[in-house]
Amino acid sequence: MHNFTDMRDENSHDEIWLVEHYPVFTQGQAGKAEHILMPGDIPVVQSDRGGQVTYHGPGQQVMYVLLNLKRRKLGVRDLVTLLEQTVVNTLAEIGIEAHPRADAPGVYVGEKKICSLGLRIRRGCSFHGLALNVNMDLSPFLRINPCGYAGMEMAKITQWKEDATTDNIAPRLLANILALLNNPPYEYIAA
């Protein structure tokens, strides 16, 4: 992701990467040590993205957005709104009503956070992205103050849609972001 961003030029195509991570806490640039309560056996990795601490693990769909914002005429706030709307639209397709919050970036179902965001912009290009909780173990979130909020309750899609997996959510997520970016049809290739 860093190498791609460092090496790209005005003619480089944008890319969207869909991945799952092994268990890890990532601490953003604004991260404060007091928000990491009991990491235990889960490693803590410093990240150059914005935001505080979050957890990544199996069953969570991470989407890295490697976009040339200058070329797309998008500001940072525009990108945050676009990512939040991507998740809202994806969840609406499977019958889950979700919403962003002005006071805490991300996407929520009721008061529970289901998706976290963290971005970095370098030379007008974005990297990092979002993490959507699909069918993961949420208990590691109890070891941190998610996104710097003590007591933040986290959620996952399978609380409302039992058959959800990253395999059936990833293509929907990709289709929704491409629609909002006004991109042409795409081919989804699972690695």
Swiss-Prot record:
The keyword Transferase applies. It is found in: Cytoplasm. The keyword 4Fe-4S does not apply. Residues 10-185 form the BPL/LPL catalytic domain. It is an enzyme of class 2 (transferase). Its EC number is 2.3.1.181. Substrate binds at residues 49-56, 116-118, 129-131. Pathway: Protein modification; protein lipoylation via endogenous pathway; protein N(6)-(lipoyl)lysine from octanoyl-[acyl-carrier-protein]: step 1/2. Keywords: Acyltransferase, Cytoplasm, Transferase. Pfam families: LplA-B_cat. The active site is at 147 (acyl-thioester intermediate). InterPro entries: aa-tRNA-synth_II/BPL/LPL, BPL_LPL_catalytic, Octanoyltransferase, Octanoyltransferase_CS. GO terms for cellular component: cytoplasm. PROSITE patterns: BPL_LPL_CATALYTIC (PS51733), LIPB (PS01313). GO terms for biological process: protein modification process. One of its GO terms (molecular function) is lipoyl(octanoyl) transferase activity. Belongs to the LipB family. In the reaction, the free carboxyl group of octanoic acid is attached via an amide linkage to the epsilon-amino group of a specific lysine residue of lipoyl domains of lipoate-dependent enzymes. This is Octanoyltransferase. It comes from Salmonella choleraesuis (strain SC-B67).
